[in-house]
Amino acid sequence: EERQVLRFEADRIESGGLPLPTRTDGEAEKITEKEETYFYSYDACDGRRSTGKAKAGCRISAGVKAGGYRELGVVFSVCGAGVREPMLHSTGFRAEDGNPDIHTRSRAGVRMSWREMTAWQIIEEQKACRKELEERAGFSSDMAVCLAKSASQFIAKRESTGGDTILAGFPFFEDWGRDTMIALPGVCLSTRRYDEARSILRTFARYEKDALMPNLFPEGGEEPMYNTVDAALLFINCVWLYYDATEDLAFVEEMYPVMERILEGYRKGTRFGIHMDQDGLIMAGEGLDQVTWMDVRVGEILPTPRHGKPVEVNAYWYNALCIMAAFSRKRGGDGAEYERLAEKVRGSFAEAFWMEEKHCLKDVISGTDADTQIRCNQIWAISMPFTMLDPERERQVVDTVFEKLYTPYGLRTLSQDDPQFRPSYGGEVLERDLAYHQGTVWAYPLGAYYLAYLKVNGRNGEERKRAEEYVRDQMQVLESALREGCIGQLPEIYDGENPVSSKGCFAQAWSVGEILRVYEHLEKVSE
């Protein structure tokens, strides 16, 4: 078999007469060719620094001092630019009736194995898959279209359960229960992948145990881990959002016994100190178990201890009670028991969590200094479908979050004026763990912030229009994030003080999903 021959000339790199688009850490001078920015520089996770250049049809040069030495890195790929068109062939697959899973259908419909297909056939098939994803999602803005296709990369089949799941992030994370329940509304529902949403929810419903949802499915068929207080409550929220999108009451009936067990278990008490207190609020956490999303543990050190009554958990609890009251009525009941408890929770929440002097909510009720720290967790008390605060207090929370925590790339996990604030995420594992939720910017809460902002600033027509324009303008900044790190994806985190370079996972499911929910609101719901 003839080997590929690369030809290097003064102003180009060729293979078989086809000019190759290149990326280099040298200086790129544009020449007359089609330009496509397909490639961006990256290096090891948690330390990406180089931005590089992405150019097609370039003359590449680099300066070297006398007697010096420099390696010039060049990454190139083939595209259709240049003197000849590549030979493209039909992929030979067709849509199978009754099978809406794009990836399954594509694989099942190919008439030859992957090994028998040419590179161009594989490329054309993937183009067709991505085109169908784009059309199904129905977004119009370029960023939303891109994210709708990127979202599909997180949906996977889990062999140990036999069902669909959502991988939390690349390259580090598997499918975490909490992450899945936060990501699912955007990754599946906003993109109209309802079959996958049902499959995922059925998988988790099957593994419900002691009123809890799995936090992690270990490899090798081992027993799932259940150390999460929020996944089960967010499961109920996902069923509600699924019903809101599909009006599939039959699926609600299927999930209803599971949801009943969850709320009953939280009322009576279950593992990890999770139980309802006398005031109706949920308490969680005991010993060294970290059961909220701020879950870092370093040996016997808990950098962000949140044992007690976490603010977002009680927002999820109230939301779940209201959802079950609504579902009960749709099934022919009156929902009175859930409504009475929800009303009790509503009164207790406002009294226990509101800080008049700071115009926002406490982060946790624990009797420690951590209670009054200003953190991003309070934003979910405004953005959930059912909330407890009056409109004026909701507006104050959104304003405080903007003033203390907002960046265009995400929300800080802790206010910069807090003595425990850590400005950067880096160094050894211990240093990173200690900074993980102590000021580090997380991308995914940004979706909840924008939804909350649209809620409190959208109570009449003109105000709503201005709010939507503001959010659209702010989200344009995120377009640069699609070109840094992993192309077309949104990352996990950024430094707290200067959030300009992504860190952690370069592609995070809940980051993508939550921004898709905002676009869904702007492009579909508001219309």
Question: Where do the protein language model's features map onto the residues?
Answer:
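Acidic, mature catalytic/reactive cores of soluble proteins
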Residues: 1-527
